[in-house]
């Protein structure tokens, strides 16, 4: 059959250009990526043949083979895995199905070191072949297909690709790389074997190369007989003492396609009523598309060394950054995704590994603060989801949280709740916090004034998830959590008797004017009262204890969500009785000026809080009216 010509989709063209011009210094990854693809193909066949043995075609000696030919200047990576149909070849090799590709390409900066890291997080897979090859040929036949229905794919990465139907005796895929002249040093047994041992030594499938013998003069002879060149015992089944740090790191890179080392790993063997082996990794950095809701996550589930699937049921969503492998002996080989969603063994494993991960993070936070800070900076926001999502582990997760505070000096989130409690003022039984859009907005919020004056530390929460998190985190270690922008604030125990008496006198003096201000503002406020929060600013707005904060209201509006009735939508206006503007208002006889100043005090407080102002132009005109 004649060959058909195709063009790459735009994203592939761009990615190929990046691979060829940006990753030449990381050329070794090509073999890791091709071996990984072959391993995946074999694992898929191993799984599908459980229910359809005919797919094996009487060949169950699964293996990956690596051959090289110095004369032809080629390296061939072949497998007897599941193979591909013509449609799958076009889909898998001509397009990038991975979501977020466009965003990834747009995020590249032109800085090679930064871009290499991004490319490593994205994973280039098969296309890494073009780092070392100027032409790639793929020959493949899907298991169960007729021998005459195989497919050949050819590309030089410059002019699209061609596809034609061929005959192929054995199922599976072979990738033939026509090596560029600057990479001909790869065409050596010891070089290729070294790359296998470096990057792919611990995979489950035998990797074979033809034996090489040397005579007394060191002359090399390549035999026709193949030998296995990798350690085929799965790394997660080996004893911790048998595995080096380098092997752990290379296996992480193999399963994650990350260029960077893992931050930490957790290798565990569980025996008893429930038996499984696990090897879990926490990356150093979050991938570029980490917040993409369509992105799949999950651990690789094996049953007695047979790969079953990537399964998100093994992890709660707030631990979706964890990579790794679970190998269970307590599940059937023919288990389906639907069965796993309601499987007691899976539920027990999930509970156990969640507990283990949180325990190891606690140890890390205690033993290596710098390393834990690296983890927190990358994954702290997603860990916060667990406070609301995982009630049984809420206290453990809360202990792992880190925040900026009024005493930490900058926006870096380094303070734990235990740290906060350890330096609470004598007599303080409440953990105070404020939520806001940014560190500066939080740190300069007028509602902090009384706390700063009294030396009471306040946690500054600026992540979007913080409002949701704090709706369920109401206490920690027996201490009540209190938002300083909600309800009344009782700091009387830190006041002198003179100041208490002074405030009571001011409250009586302002009783009449507060009612008049409320009448002027009508339904714009729930109440008007004197503030115990303010020392320098004239006004601020709060909501009642059970109402939705103005910050939360703003976020919901931005997300296009409507409000349920009775959620405390109207703000409470608080005034600083000692401020000149408030004193002027108290003594103002002109009703128009009184109304204007009342409105101005409300609007400027709303503005500082980042709340929505319905008519910004009216606010500006009001300010301009009284500028002298």
Curated annotation (Swiss-Prot):
Region annotated C, chain positions: 555-628
Disulfide cross-links: none
Domain of life: Bacteria
CDD domains, per database record: HATPase_Hsp90-like (cd16927)
A Pfam entry, by short name: HATPase_c_3
Keywords noted in UniProt: ATP-binding, Chaperone, Cytoplasm, Nucleotide-binding, Stress response
Alphabetized GO MF terms: ATP binding; ATP hydrolysis activity; ATP-dependent protein folding chaperone; unfolded protein binding
Region ranges (B): 338-554
InterPro entries per UniProt: HATPase_C_sf, Heat_shock_protein_90_CS, HSP90_C, Hsp90_fam, Hsp90_N, Ribosomal_Su5_D2-typ_SF
Signal peptide: none
Family: Belongs to the heat shock protein 90 family.
Role, per record: Molecular chaperone. Has ATPase activity.
PANTHER family: HEAT SHOCK PROTEIN 90 FAMILY MEMBER (PTHR11528)
Listed name of the protein: Chaperone protein HtpG
Organism name: Francisella tularensis subsp. tularensis (strain WY96-3418)
């Amino acid at each position: 059959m004649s060959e058909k010509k195709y063009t790459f989709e735009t994203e592939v063209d761009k990615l190929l250009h990046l691979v060829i011009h940006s990753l030449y210094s990381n050329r070794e990854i090509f073999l890791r990526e091709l071996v990984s693809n072959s391993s995946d193909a074999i694992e898929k066949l191993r799984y599908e043949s459980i229910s359809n043995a005919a797919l094996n075609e009487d060949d169950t000696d699964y293996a990956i083979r690596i051959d090289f030919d110095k004369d032809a200047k080629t390296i061939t990576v072949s497998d007897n895995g599941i193979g591909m149909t013509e449609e799958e070849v076009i889909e898998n090799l001509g397009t990038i199905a991975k979501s977020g590709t466009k965003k990834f390409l747009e995020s590249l900066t032109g800085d090679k070191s930064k871009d290499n890291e991004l490319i490593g997080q994205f994973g280039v897979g098969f296309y890494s072949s073009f780092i070392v090859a100027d032409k790639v040929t793929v020959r493949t036949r899907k298991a169960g297909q007729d021998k005459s229905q195989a497919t050949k794919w050819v590309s030089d990465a410059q002019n699209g690709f061609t596809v034609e139907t061929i005959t192929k005796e054995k199922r599976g895929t072979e990738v033939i790389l026509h090596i560029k002249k600057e990479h001909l040093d790869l065409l050596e047994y010891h070089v290729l074997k070294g790359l296998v041992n470096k990057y792919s030594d611990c995979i489950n499938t035998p990797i074979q190369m033809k034996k090489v013998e040397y005579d007394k003069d060191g002359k090399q002879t390549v035999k026709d007989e193949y030998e296995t060149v990798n350690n085929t015992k799965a790394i997660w089944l080996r004893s911790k003492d048998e595995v080096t740090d380098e092997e752990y790191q290379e296996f992480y890179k193999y399963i994650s396609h990350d260029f960077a080392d893992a931050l930490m790993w957790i290798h565990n063997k569980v025996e008893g009523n429930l038996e499984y082996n696990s090897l879990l990794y926490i990356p150093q950095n979050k991938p570029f598309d980490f917040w993409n809701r369509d992105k799949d996550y999950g651990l690789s589930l094996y049953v007695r060394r047979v790969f079953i699937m990537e399964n998100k049921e093994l992890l709660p969503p707030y631990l979706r950054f964890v990579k790794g492998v679970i190998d269970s002996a307590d599940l059937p080989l023919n288990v389906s995704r639907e069965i796993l969603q309601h499987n007691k063994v899976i539920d027990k494993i999930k509970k156990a590994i969640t507990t283990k991960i949180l325990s190891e993070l606690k140890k890390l936070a205690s033993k290596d603060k710098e390393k834990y800070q690296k983890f927190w900076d990358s994954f702290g926001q997603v860990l916060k989801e667990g406070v609301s999502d995982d009630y049984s582990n809420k206290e453990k997760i809360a202990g792992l949280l880190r925040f900026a505070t009024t005493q930490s000096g900058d926006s870096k989130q380094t303070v734990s709740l235990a740290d906060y409690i350890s330096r609470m003022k004598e007599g303080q039984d409440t953990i105070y916090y404020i939520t806001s859009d940014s560190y500066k907005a939080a740190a300069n919020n007028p509602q902090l004034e009384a706390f700063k004056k009294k030396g009471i530390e306040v946690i500054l929460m600026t992540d979007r998830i913080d409002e949701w998190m704090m709706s369920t985190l109401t206490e920690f270690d027996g201490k009540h959590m209190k938002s300083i922008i909600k309800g009344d604030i009782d700091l009387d125990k830190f006041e002198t008797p003179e100041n208490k008496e002074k405030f009571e006198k001011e409250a009586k003096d302002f009783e009449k004017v507060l009612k008049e201000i409320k009448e002027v503002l009508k339904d714009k406020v729930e109440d008007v009262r004197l503030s115990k929060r303010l020392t320098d600013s004239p006004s601020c707005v709060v909501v009642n204890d059970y109402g939705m904060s103005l910050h939360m209201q703003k976020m919901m509006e931005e997300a296009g969500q409507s409000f349920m009735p009775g959620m405390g939508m109207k703000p409470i206006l608080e005034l600083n009785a000692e401020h000149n503007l408030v004193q002027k208002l108290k003594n103002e006889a002109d009703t128009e000026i009184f109304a204007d100043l009342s409105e101005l005090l409300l609007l400027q407080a709303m503005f500082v809080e980042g709340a929505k102002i319905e008519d910004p132009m009216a606010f500006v005109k009001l300010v301009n009216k009284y500028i002298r």
